[in-house]
Amino acid sequence: MSDIDQLNASLLAEIAAANDEAALEAVRVSALGKKGSVSELLKTLGAMTPEERQTRGAAINVLKNAVTEALAARKATLRQEAINARLKAETVDVSLPVRSSPAERGRIHPISQIVDEITAIFADMGFSIAEGPDIETDYYNFTALNFPEGHPAREMHDTFFFHPDENGERKVLRTHTSPVQVRTMETQKPPIRIIIPGKTYRQDSDATHSPMFHQVEGLVIDKKANVANIRWVLEEFCKTFFEVDSVTMRFRPSFFPFTEPSFEVDIQCDRSGPIVKFGEGTDWMEILGCGMVHPNVLRYGGLDPDEYQGFAWGMGLDRIAMLKYGMPDLRDFFNADVRWMTHYGFRPLDMPTLFGGLSA
């Protein structure tokens, strides 16, 4: 056995015997360091004849490569063994109670809670969730929703526009979640029953408005959808959401470009106290907008309005959260105030269900 073969066997044995990364690093330095055994052999290449370099030089390079590969493989093995040992030692007892210190107790944001509540309600009615991009094209945000040229919503004072792209097109931060209606109609055959929760953006900011706010809307498309269906769906939703036995609602004629006929919906309530009470009283409060999907919107979605019809509704999540839980200022939703979250937030394990209670 040549000296190179002996050195190779010795180094590979030392590498295999290394029990941790520190020991392995010591072997690497002794072999490949500036004065390592393999490095010293490489220094002799310059003094060799061409014939020796072809044979002995090649053998030295093979040795170097073998040692390098063995070091890398052993290092990977040691790291995996360390991870396995750590995982074995670190156990989590899932039966332990949640930490009770107020400083350590997390809270679910009211908006997340409201989304979960609404999802639970409409899932029980057979609806699914649909989503879409926050950055929209003019086509999906306006044109496909029957907004005419020159509509105020297309102006800079109301909508956040991006700079024009290379084609001159200006994208927008969506002003409503309605573009998802058209996107869904393009990709899904009727019957369609969806709700669309998400962020929306408009240039408005005060105690009840924010430049970024949350909406949810619903869409039903089939061959027999009608206004009576809208009323039933919304009444069932409001009863369940506000956790009352009955609600009285009134539908006022209104105008939205994407529905015809269009309605604004008021719910009867009692506003005499600091908290609005639903299901009682003689006051009225506007809560959402709705209507039958405009035939032009159906056409943009690739559906024949002579065969299909539908209804849609939309409401502000932030606003109904304020109404239900008595929050006075919308801006507090986004201030990241731990005290506010401690007061208005929800415990993580209290998931809203129709059987256990939405806001338990």
UniProtKB/Swiss-Prot annotation:
It is an enzyme of class 6 (ligase). Mg(2+) binds at E260. One of its GO terms (molecular function) is phenylalanine-tRNA ligase activity. GO terms for cellular component: cytoplasm. Keywords: Aminoacyl-tRNA synthetase, ATP-binding, Cytoplasm, Ligase, Magnesium, Metal-binding, Nucleotide-binding, Protein biosynthesis. The keyword Plastid does not apply. It catalyses: tRNA(Phe) + L-phenylalanine + ATP = L-phenylalanyl-tRNA(Phe) + AMP + diphosphate + H(+). CDD domains: PheRS_alpha_core. InterPro entries: aa-tRNA-synth_II, aa-tRNA-synth_II/BPL/LPL, Phe-tRNA-synth_IIc_asu, Phe-tRNA_ligase_II_N, Phe_tRNA_ligase_alpha1_bac, Phenylalanyl-tRNA_Synthase, tRNA-bd_arm. Its EC number is 6.1.1.20. HAMAP family: Phe_tRNA_synth_alpha1 (MF_00281). NCBIfam families: pheS. PANTHER family: PHENYLALANINE--TRNA LIGASE, MITOCHONDRIAL (PTHR11538:SF41), PHENYLALANYL-TRNA SYNTHETASE (PTHR11538). Belongs to the class-II aminoacyl-tRNA synthetase family. Phe-tRNA synthetase alpha subunit type 1 subfamily. This is Phenylalanine--tRNA ligase alpha subunit. It comes from Rhizobium leguminosarum bv. trifolii (strain WSM2304).
